[in-house]
């Protein structure tokens, strides 16, 4: 199963279109700096503003660039079950190693509806699916008991926990045990969740600090807890700055400041407020990502 630091990759744009050259360069940046897996077309990848064709093309491009060096876990979630099936089948056909599927948003299904949604998609494909539990975006939380039921479904292999609740993670790990891998969806809780038995992180912070995020997960997997705690504490000011506005506004801005890609966003996302930009820039300087 997937372990370590898996980056929730941004989607670089140039003049309104996907910047394919920068996308390939970002993949190489991660592979050179120890990232353990690439996750395109998630929340950080602005999947909500991608066309269906762009979504499929980005996943194919990332798979081609990675060339089997690390796993590619494609974002394939939708609030339409049939659309989630289509996206996941297409990702599997393209060679994705797994899929990350956000819980249905806006229509706010019941726990039974969430269960049936994932069951239908899992039965339609042969690649492992990581459930994405982020109630702040979806409007509904997947309860630990529901995840325990889902852990019995073939191909449901893990959950990205972005509830921000350590109690939630404890209950999921307690109820599911080895049947369901748990990944942190909060960069500030990587150490905490891995100390409880989590397998890694699907990370926004890794976009700009891939080496340090990978080192943190490696330390935890080796049970080098003092080292892991030290790295987590070092990352905290940067993590807070990266979430000073809606993700991925700050992280794309940070990558632009680093010269990795443009900071271009698609509406309804807009550039950072000047005061927040100054705070982000200072945090990046303090961490050593920028000079001066």
Regions found by a protein language model. Name each.
Residues 1-7, 11-141, 290:
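Active-site beta->alpha loop and helix N-cap motifs at the rims of alpha/beta catalytic domains
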Residues 4-12, 29, 33-35, 195-198, ...:
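C-terminal alpha-helical cap/extension of soluble enzyme domains
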Residues 23, 55, 59, 84, ...:
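A general structural signal for well-ordered alpha-helical segments in protein cores
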Residues 33, 57, 61-66, 90, ...:
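Alpha-helical structural signal in soluble globular domains
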Residues 50-53, 86, 111-114, 142-144, ...:
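Short secondary-structure transition/capping segments
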Residues 123-124, 137-243:
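Catalytic alpha/beta core domains of metabolic enzymes, predominantly
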Residues 133, 155-156, 266-267:
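Glycine-rich phosphate-binding "P-loop"
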């Amino acid at each position: 199963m997937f372990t370590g630091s898996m980056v929730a990759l941004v989607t670089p744009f140039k003049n309104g279109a996907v910047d394919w050259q920068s996308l390939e360069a970002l993949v190489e940046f991660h592979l050179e700096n120890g990232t353990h897996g690439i996750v395109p077309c998630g929340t950080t990848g602005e999947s909500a503003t991608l066309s269906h064709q762009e979504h499929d093309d980005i996943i194919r491009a990332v798979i081609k660039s990675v060339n089997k060096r690390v796993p590619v876990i494609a974002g394939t979630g939708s609030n339409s079950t049939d659309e989630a099936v289509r996206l996941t089948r297409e990702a599997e056909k393209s060679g994705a190693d797994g899929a990350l599927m956000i819980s249905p948003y806006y229509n706010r299904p019941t726990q039974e509806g969430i269960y049936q949604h994932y069951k239908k998609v899992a039965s339609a494909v042969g690649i492992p699916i990581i459930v994405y539990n982020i109630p702040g975006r979806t409007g509904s939380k997947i309860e630990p008991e529901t995840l325990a039921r889902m852990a019995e479904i073939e191909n449901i292999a893990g959950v990205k926990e972005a509830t921000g609740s350590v109690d939630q993670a404890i209950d999921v790990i307690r109820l599911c045990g080895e049947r369901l891998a748990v990944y942190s969806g909060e960069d500030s809780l990587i150490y905490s969740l891995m100390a409880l038995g989590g397998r890694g992180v699907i990370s926004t912070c890794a976009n700009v600090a891939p080496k340090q995020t990978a080192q943190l997960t490696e330390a935890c997997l080796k049970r080098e807890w003092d080292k892991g705690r030290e790295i987590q504490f070092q990352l905290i000011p940067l993590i807070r700055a990266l979430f000073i506005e809606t993700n991925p506004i700050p992280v794309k801005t940070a990558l632009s400041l680093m010269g990795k890609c443009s900071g271009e966003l698609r509406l309804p996302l807009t550039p950072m407020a000047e005061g927040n930009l100054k705070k982000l820039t200072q945090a990046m300087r303090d961490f050593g990502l920028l000079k001066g």
